[in-house]
From Swiss-Prot:
GO terms for molecular function: DNA-binding transcription activator activity, RNA polymerase II-specific; RNA polymerase II cis-regulatory region sequence-specific DNA binding; sequence-specific DNA binding. This is Transcription factor SOX-2. Keywords: Activator, Developmental protein, DNA-binding, Nucleus, Transcription, Transcription regulation. Residues 241-259 have a biased composition (Low complexity). Gene3D superfamilies: High mobility group box domain. One of its GO terms (cellular component) is nucleus. First expressed in the embryonic neural plate shortly before closure and expression continues in the neural tube. From stage 16 onwards, expressed throughout the CNS including the brain, with expression predominant in the undifferentiated cells of the neural epithelium. Also expressed at a low level in the retina and the gut epithelium. Highly expressed in the lens placode at stage 13 and in the lens at stage 17. GO terms for biological process: brain development; cell fate commitment; negative regulation of neuron differentiation; negative regulation of transcription by RNA polymerase II; neuron differentiation; positive regulation of DNA-templated transcription; positive regulation of transcription by RNA polymerase II; sensory organ precursor cell fate determination. The keyword Endoplasmic reticulum does not apply. The keyword Transcription applies. Transcriptional activator. Binds to the consensus DNA sequence 5'-TCATTGTTGTTG-3'. In cooperation with other transcription factors, binds to the promoter sequence of the crystallin gene to activate transcription in the lens. Downstream SRRT target that mediates the promotion of neural stem cell self-renewal. Keeps neural cells undifferentiated by counteracting the activity of proneural proteins and suppresses neuronal differentiation. May function as a switch in neuronal development. Coiled coil: none annotated.
Amino acid sequence: MYNMMETELKPPAPQQTSGGGTGNSNSAANNQKNSPDRVKRPMNAFMVWSRGQRRKMAQENPKMHNSEISKRLGAEWKLLSEAEKRPFIDEAKRLRALHMKEHPDYKYRPRRKTKTLMKKDKYTLPGGLLAPGTNTMTTGVGVGATLGAGVNQRMDSYAHMNGWTNGGYGMMQEQLGYPQHPGLNAHNAAQMQPMHRYDVSALQYNSMTSSQTYMNGSPTYSMSYSQQGTPGMALGSMGSVVKTESSSSPPVVTSSSHSRAPCQAGDLRDMISMYLPGAEVPEPAAPSRLHMSQHYQSAPVPGTAINGTLPLSHM
């Protein structure tokens, strides 16, 4: 058996390549491999076994690629038992000892293959300008999507916390989600402002009388309602929020804060100038807005007395 292996392991005679004027790189590489100065590594047990098996499989399947033959040989080698591998392991040890005896100064130095540049490496911009730009755009889109998702989650949490399941305050959430453009002309603002102020005040009064837990649960949300609506009611709603949080009896303080005396004209003008741009507020429209805001501030809450006390129906 060993004699058969030795006959198979004899290196073939070096083939002399015809020195044509082609100058092919493959022929140069083959000449370098077959040069007598280069010392090959000793074969391991798998290479000793696969040497004869590869030749046999190549003869049986002439159209099979060498890589596919290597895969099949590796799978077959794993299926072999230790007793079947033993003679090939011993032969590999003998070849290694012989190799060390013939070449005592041999040291394995793996040759680094010079890989050809890929297309993306050939045509990249100098300084890596293309990749950072794409990463910046991707990052910006990701941040925008994350912020939008965070706002939607916050709105949904407010709605479910207050007991309104995406229906009671749907329109107000849409108005809060899309900020209004500051460049609206004064004429449209003067026409649309009384109707918008009336709707917001009605919603706020109904929410106070029906459910006090809405004001107690999310004061910031009600504050945003008042800021989205009339500027004249913003101070009253802010005061009611502060008093509702600090006092021990929220219903009494909230109703009394809405039925308090109207503010002075100068304070209301300062408050309007604080919430609206100065150039867009015409002076003739100011008395009408002051009158409307005073009217809604002095309007009594349904279900309360004139002095702001609770009705006696519970006694």
